[in-house]
Swiss-Prot record:
CDD domains: MFS_Tpo1_MDR_like (cd17323)
Domain of life: Eukaryota
Name of the molecule in the record: Uncharacterized transporter C1529.01
Cellular component GO terms, alphabetical: endoplasmic reticulum; plasma membrane
Lineage of source species: Eukaryota, Fungi, Dikarya, Ascomycota, Taphrinomycotina
Family to which the UniProt record says this protein belongs: Belongs to the major facilitator superfamily.
Length: 491
């Protein structure tokens, strides 16, 4: 049996004529209240906010150690600068691994279980970081904590695909994708004060307490949303109650032990990474932007403490500018992307296409490079602190606009396998986030903040124009070359 068999074209709403097969288990009607897409808005958004809260934890915990690296290095007698940077970067490296495992497993066991297991792993090993006695223990515990906290980063897009129709996804993606981007800006603001007034251990213990609170909320409130899991469980119950094995879903996987589905599920994102042109293009775009974001964020403390001579607690407040940009970009893009999508859909005789998400990416192409230019040259000439902060806010607006379009494009294209497709993007972007900061300070030392950020701006501008052109003019062709895409252009 082909375990990777595509479902029928109507998988988005599961509208299947059960008269042809009385044993086919599907939604009772297009308005079936058990279908997560038909849940009331309050229940949908409760799920989304919980998953977003989980997704906030990892990036926030990853960046919180930045202002305290000197404290941690002194505690463990770390002299080598690479070993010191590894305390931060090892967390980002595991972000590339975890979603490639958690996302496909959620397409076997469901979203809820994977989210909660990942959170428990994070709670245990993040607490252990505060208790570490050697640098080896710190590296190991940081790696394992990162593995657990990165689980939601691979499941967020899949959850959106489960809950929202294409016309509704813009605002949902706006909230979901804000979390992993807002985390790195919130973390240093909090840890800047921790570094100045208390011990580094409270970096780990504070995030553990917050994570435990979110986990407690999830126990009664977090529901399963994945259609395969919900319908598969319904088929199993019917077979058990009637002592038969005739009931099945459109995927015909109910009679296969779940462990046998694990291997093909784990191979799915790997296949996407190397064989699906549309995934490769979108992942490369996101990697460049995320890598540049982390390059700037990790060199932020140096700019404010060494060039502007601010105390760590005050220097950390400059991250608020990035947070403002992300929040503004999130709200603006959420409105813009849905309105643009509906407008283009009407012009296309009511037929949707993933390419209708491209205009919001194009809008981000202006803000991101412009913000980098402003940030770089105001920092170069030591203008008032508001100058670099305005630049940081601008490029974060552009980052959010671009991300919104790319993530929604992947969700529209891969539908029920949205989690796997976005896990690939998460993997590639996390590798970039690990690698880019390694040369960031050397680049600024050589080129200065002005030309260094100008170079980054030109890279963003070029990659964005290429990506937008390929998606808008050749997206349909690229999707045709990507055999795992579920969206059909005649739908």
């Amino acid at each position: 049996m082909d375990l990777e068999k595509k479902p029928q074209d109507k998988v988005e709403t599961a509208e299947i004529d059960v008269k042809e097969d009385p044993f086919l288990v599907t939604w009772q009607s297009p308005t079936d209240p058990k279908n997560p897409k038909n849940w009331i808005y309050a229940r949908k958004w409760t799920q989304l906010i919980l998953v977003s809260a989980f997704a906030l934890l990892g990036p926030m915990a990853s960046s919180m150690v930045a202002p305290c690296l000197d404290q941690i290095a002194d505690r463990f007698h770390i002299q080598n600068s690479t070993e010191k940077a590894l305390i931060l970067s090892i967390y980002l490296l595991v972000f590339a691994i975890s979603p490639m495992i958690s996302a496909p497993l959620s397409e076997v066991f469901g979203r809820r279980m994977l989210l909660q297991v990942g959170n428990v792993i994070f709670i245990v090993f993040n607490m252990a970081c505060g208790l570490a006695r050697t640098k080896a223990q710190m590296y190991i515990f940081r790696f394992l904590a990162g593995f657990g906290s990165a689980t939601p980063m691979g499941l967020g897009s899949g959850t959106i695909s489960d809950l929202f129709t294409p016309d509704e996804r813009g605002k949902a993606v706006a909230v979901m994708s804000l979390a992993p981007l807002l985390g790195p800006t919130i973390g240093p603001v909090v840890s800047g004060f921790i570094a100045e007034y208390t011990t580094y251990k409270w970096i780990f213990w504070s995030t553990t307490i917050f994570s435990g609170f979110i986990f407690a909320l999830s126990l009664p409130l977090l529901a399963e949303t994945y259609p395969k899991t919900l319908l598969g469980e319904k088929a199993r119950k019917l077979n058990k109650s009637e002592k038969t094995n005739k009931y099945h879903t459109e995927w015909n996987l109910e009679h296969i032990p779940r462990l046998k589905l694990v291997t093909p599920a784990l191979m799915r994102p790997i296949r996407m990474l190397f064989t699906q042109p549309i995934v490769i293009l979108c992942s490369t775009y996101m990697a460049i932007q995320y890598g540049i974001l982390y390059l700037v964020l990790t060199t932020y403390p140096t700019l404010w403490t060494e060039e502007y001579h601010e105390r760590p607690s005050i220097a950390g407040l400059n991250y608020i500018a990035s947070g403002i940009g992300l929040i503004f970009g999130s709200q603006a893009s959420g409105i813009f992307i849905d309105k643009t999508f509906r407008y283009l859909k009407r012009r296309n005789n009511g037929k949707m296409a993933p390419e209708f998400r491209v205009p919001v990416i194009l809008l981000g192409t202006f803000f991101f490079p412009a913000g980098l230019f402003i940030y770089g040259w105001t920092a170069q000439y030591h203008t008032h602190w508001i100058g670099p902060d305005i630049g940081a806010a601008m490029f974060n607006i552009g980052l959010m606009l671009g991300w919104r379009g790319i993530q929604t494009y992947l969700i529209d294209s891969f539908m029920i396998y949205a989690a796997s497709s976005t896990a690939v993007a998460c993997c590639v972007r996390s590798i970039a986030a690990f690698a880019f900061p390694l040369f960031g300070q050397d680049m600024y030392d050589t080129l200065g903040y002005g030309w260094g950020n100008s170079l980054l701006a030109f890279i963003v501008l070029g990659s964005s124009i290429i990506t937008c052109s390929l998606l808008w003019f050749g997206g349909k062709r690229l999707r045709a070359l990507s055999s795992m895409v579920i969206f059909k252009d005649d739908v």
